[in-house]
């Protein structure tokens, strides 16, 4: 009887141990499943944000620095942009503009305070859009075309759905074959307008073979 009782107690102990092990294992599995689910949800949200967010390029205009356009080069550029459909707010202070003529690649950054939000009668005129005077070869300024959310702070401008701005930059860092500063005729320019999150706006155009106007549509 004592032997049978001992065997019964031993079996009970083994059974309890098995139950405890199973419970611990189940807890680990449930915890892991919960972690993986949360991670998958976070990844899904991030992917959705990446796909839906981004910058759309509307038009690109170039400005020739000569009263006789055929004798000049493009020394200023205005890139008109707005958010993609479904995009969240885009911090323009974190946007990068990349341009290349095949010989040189330039990265432009926003310089705090270079934002113009008044009426525009001549976009490329330094005396009217005065921020041109402080735009360097590697910085860009912002001219506000439409600010639906009134969030275009000079230091931290935010581009939201319904907004349109022109990103203003100088192209005098490029040189023609005859060593003139600016972008000459028949030059292919490629690049991107890259937001911190979301799809980049693609730049890809070739300048006209002859410049007939001081202001021209490039893309």
UniProtKB/Swiss-Prot annotation:
Q: Where in the cell is it found?
A: Archaeal flagellum
What are its GO cellular component terms?
A: archaeal-type flagellum
Q: What is its main location?
A: other
Its family remark reads: Belongs to the archaeal flagellin family.
In Gene Ontology terms, what is a biological process of this protein? archaeal or bacterial-type flagellum-dependent cell motility
Give the protein's function.
Flagellin is the subunit protein which polymerizes to form the filaments of archaeal flagella.
Those residues forming the propeptide, per the database entry, are: 1-5
Organism taxonomic ancestry: Archaea, Methanobacteriati, Methanobacteriota, Thermococci, Thermococcales
Gene Ontology MF, one: structural molecule activity
Q: Which UniProt keywords apply?
A: Archaeal flagellum
Matching entries from PANTHER family are given as: FLAGELLIN B1
Keyword Cell division among record annotations = no
Protein's recorded name: Flagellin B4
